[in-house]
Amino acid sequence: MYIDIKEIPFLKKINLRLDPNDKNCVSSCSEILGTMLPTKANTYSVNAINEKVIWLGPDEWLIVSDDDNAFLKLLNKTRNLEANVTDVSENRTIIRIRGKYIYVLLSKFLVLDLEKNLSTDSSCAQTLFVKVPVLLVRNRYDAIDIFTNRSHTNYIYNLIVDGTKNLDF
């Protein structure tokens, strides 16, 4: 058994805010992104080019893309819409943790019930990792992406590594 921990670098992270009651804006943004904006709390959708659109709140989403031009494309296409597009790529990083016992390991640092809150392939949750705000995104395989501010990356990474030392494999 193993736990694999690695940083996922160089992905674009774009914050999108808009009025969810503005059907024209929601429809246009969904068309631009190639997938519907998730309206159900703690879910995400994925488009044909594997960009994730993650629900952060009723009027806020995080788009994750490996396209370096994703921000400018979205900004230009939403220019005439009542939408706010912000590049937050330099603010956040992603730690991917993979393995059979990741829920057991992460439960040492979270009060969130992962079995309940990350039960489907398109689920996500915002919570505290010890005292650090994080976004947890379940992947389609046995992995969870932990989105956190860059300044907390080493702290979280070191806690996870320390936490593996007394797992009973």
Model-flagged regions — what are they?
Residues 1-169:
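Basic, glycine/lysine-rich polyanion-binding surfaces/domains
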